[in-house]
């Protein structure tokens, strides 16, 4: 089952995992991030997205999971978190 959860970038191990995941897509972690979430299949990170102010950033889905509507889940999670933070 695929689950969503916040990734705490203050944890060096969690941050390293996000950076390495993004690098597999030739994406560079942008920094200046207020919130990051991950999609997990069991404990495997299969997707991620972040908020930096009003901007959604660093959105990626593992290739073998693409085409399943998971980007929509990431965007929706980021929208909800943005509204929760009062950023519209």
Regions inferred by a protein language model and the residue ranges of each:
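Conserved acetyl-CoA-binding loop-helix of GNAT-fold acetyltransferases
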Residues: 67-80
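Short secondary-structure boundary/capping segments
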Residues: 28-29, 48
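Conserved beta-strand in the GNAT
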Residues: 38, 44-60
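Short amphipathic alpha-helix that is part of the acyltransferase structural core
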Residues: 1-28
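Short, small/polar residue-rich loop motifs at catalytic or cofactor-binding pockets
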Residues: 31-33
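Conserved GNAT acetyl-CoA-binding A-motif
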Residues: 82-88
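Extended, structured, electrostatic nucleic-acid-contact surfaces
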Residues: 63-64
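Small side chains
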Residues: 4, 38, 47-49, 79-82
């Amino acid at each position: 089952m695929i689950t969503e959860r916040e990734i705490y970038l203050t944890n060096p191990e969690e941050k390293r995992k996000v950076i390495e995941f993004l690098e597999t897509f030739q994406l560079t972690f942008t920094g200046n991030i207020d919130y990051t979430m991950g999609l997990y299949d069991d404990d495997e990170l299969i997707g991620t997205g972040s908020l930096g102010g009003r901007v959604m950033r660093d959105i990626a889905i593992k290739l073998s999971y693409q085409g399943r509507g998971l980007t929509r889940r990431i965007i929706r999670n980021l929208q909800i978190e943005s509204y929760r933070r009062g950023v519209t």
